[in-house]
């Protein structure tokens, strides 16, 4: 009976003594899902023309062509850095030929950062201006 307790205490002690930066190495997938790792970057000039126009509209405060532009983006999959609810807002980037809003969006963060997704929230790239 004392062996399991001793083993458990050893594991607990080892975990407490590990530097916190080593813990990120142990679980990189969890760190990535939590938005800990930096998002890939896309330069403003590399964005599709419609995305550059949408970003200009966001910075001007509108008017926006889609009713759902400006709604809260929940970041439920945690592909962006984790923030409090309401921190992120989403805006539609028109997709030529699409009959609906399409898959492209710009997500605006509360501190002035912007992210582009061309695949309906599967991947994000931070916009570098």
What positions do the PLM features span?
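Functional cores of ribonucleases/endoribonucleases
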Residues: 59-129
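N-terminal secretory signal peptides
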Residues: 25-79
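Extended, aromatic/histidine-rich regions of cofactor-dependent oxidoreductases associated
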Residues: 3-4, 15, 25, 121, ...
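Cytosolic catalytic domains that perform sulfur/thiol-centered chemistry
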Residues: 21-23, 84
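Bacterial N-terminal signal peptides
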Residues: 10-21
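Bacterial N-terminal signal peptides that target proteins for export
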Residues: 1-11
């Amino acid at each position: 009976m004392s062996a399991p307790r001793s083993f458990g205490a050893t594991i607990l002690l080892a975990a407490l003594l590990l530097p916190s930066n080593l813990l990120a190495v142990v679980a990189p997938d969890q760190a990535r899902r939590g938005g800990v790792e930096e998002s890939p970057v896309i330069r403003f000039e590399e964005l599709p023309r419609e995305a550059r126009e949408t970003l200009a509209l966001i910075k001007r405060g509108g008017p926006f062509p889609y009713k759902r532009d400006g709604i809260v983006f929940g970041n439920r999959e945690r592909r962006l850095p984790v923030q409090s609810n309401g921190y992120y807002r989403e805006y539609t980037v028109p997709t030529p030929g699409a009959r609906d809003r399409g898959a492209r969006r710009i997500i605006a963060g509360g501190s002035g950062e912007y992210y582009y997704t061309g695949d309906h929230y599967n991947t994000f790239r931070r916009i570098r201006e």
